[in-house]
Amino acid sequence: YMDFEMNMNNTKNKREGFKADLIAIGAIKYDTKTKKIEKFKSLIKPILTKTVYPHIEELTHITTEDLENAPTYESVMRSFKHWLGDFNEIDGIYTFGNLDLTCFKNTDRISSQKNNHPRFLNNIQNFFVDIKEKYLEYGVKCMNYISLTHLLELSNMKFSGDAHDPLYDAYNLHILDEILEKNQDVRNYLIIQDINKSPYNQIDDEIEAKIKDYEKYLYHKEGNYNIDDLSIDILSIVGRY
């Protein structure tokens, strides 16, 4: 499970957004047999923009001064690939969305051309799995518009550590994947979140409260509003729609 922190302009222009610099990496390696977790974290000296944008510093608490003595992208990637170990034992490298991989590709290309080193992505690109895409295939559409922190809350878990710390982000992504992989009830509850928005919540303005009542029943066994009751109400909304 891997996460990058990026230094990018606060712009709505998607092309400009893809010019982001990688400034930190966090990853955890989870052994499915032993349940052992290993950690990797490093700052990364930026290639394009040496100054950290104010909104990025506020989010990540990474300063321009922090990055002045940070290891280069090439150095960090050599350490990271060594830390990954035997590629034959890797089931996947999991990210939350495709922006991390997009910026990784761009930085890898620029650094390779500028510093004449091999493309580090060449041997690992096929291992990448977008967690959002994985659970969209289950019908969990809210993965596209709900944050990792909120997804954990809806899964009856709290985010561990500081958000926008790449190591904590990677660890919490692992926790979310573990929960959703093993617990169909939680997946179904996340699928239900899609009914709690327009136009459905305009047809039944009590649907949010009903979903919360079911959450109490699901996670805390409070009340008696169960999945059958909620399903009937949802079918009624869809029928009226």
Explain the meaning of each model-derived region:
Residues 11-13, 67, 137:
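A generic structural signal for short coil/turn motifs at secondary-structure boundaries
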